[in-house]
Amino acid sequence: MAALLMPRRNKGMRTRLGCLSHKSDSCSDFTAILPDKPNRALKRLSTEEATRWADSFDVLLSHKYGVAAFRAFLKTEFSEENLEFWLACEEFKKTRSTAKLVTKAHRIFEEFVDVQAPREVNIDFQTREATRKNMQEPSLTCFDQAQGKVHSLMEKDSYPRFLRSKMYLDLLSQSQRRLS
């Protein structure tokens, strides 16, 4: 059964990667990077929703298509690790099992926070060391300081570039054309 599904999944991935392999200002078919079924997703995305993403970074992060669009933009800049870390922290905070909490905490630390981590986020030494210390007794708040720094970095750096990007402007244009 899985083998039968593989070609469809690969085709979708090729479409997404094809769009992402270009620079961020050359990707105008935004539907390729939205989650789920792209055409239906774009039809459900209103101009008002996409415009609201410019209201604040937190508004963007609260909308699943906003996160998908921002992730696609960050991939074009090879800097999606910050968003992936932020999302992993948000998911981590929902953990209720103590055993799972410890396992997830170590996985997040090793993936994003540790020096030379595979997807190391850009945080200062003090924040990294405070987070390392928090790992001695992981809790739901052990990544709060690092997550806050990463959020601030994305908000001040990546988010303004996203709002000016051809990718975002094309998305707005496409959603407005649907209204016409």
Swiss-Prot record:
Expressed in which tissues: Expressed at high levels in brain. Very little expression detected in other tissues. Detected in Purkinje cells in the cerebellum.
Domain RGS per the UniProt entry, residue ranges: 56-171
GO cellular component: cytoplasmic side of plasma membrane; dendrite; neuronal cell body membrane; nucleus; perikaryon; synapse
Residues bearing the modification Phosphoserine: S26
GO MF terms held by the record: G-protein alpha-subunit binding; GTPase activator activity
Protein's membrane topology: Peripheral membrane protein
Superkingdom as given in the UniProt entry: Eukaryota
Gene Ontology BP annotations: G protein-coupled acetylcholine receptor signaling pathway; negative regulation of signal transduction; positive regulation of GTPase activity; regulation of dopamine receptor signaling pathway; response to amphetamine
Sorted UniProt keywords: Cell membrane, Cell projection, Membrane, Nucleus, Phosphoprotein, Signal transduction inhibitor
Pfam families: RGS
Coiled coil: none
Annotated localization: Cell membrane; Membrane; Perikaryon; Cell projection, Dendrite
InterPro entries per UniProt: RGS, RGS_RGS8, RGS_sf, RGS_subdom1/3, RGS_subdomain_2
Record text on subunit structure and interactions: Interacts with GNAO1 and GNAI3.
Biological role: Regulates G protein-coupled receptor signaling cascades, including signaling via muscarinic acetylcholine receptor CHRM2 and dopamine receptor DRD2. Inhibits signal transduction by increasing the GTPase activity of G protein alpha subunits, thereby driving them into their inactive GDP-bound form. Modulates the activity of potassium channels that are activated in response to DRD2 and CHRM2 signaling.
Name of the protein this chain belongs to: Regulator of G-protein signaling 8
Species per Swiss-Prot/TrEMBL record: Rattus norvegicus (Rat)
Lineage, top ranks: Eukaryota, Metazoa, Chordata, Craniata, Vertebrata
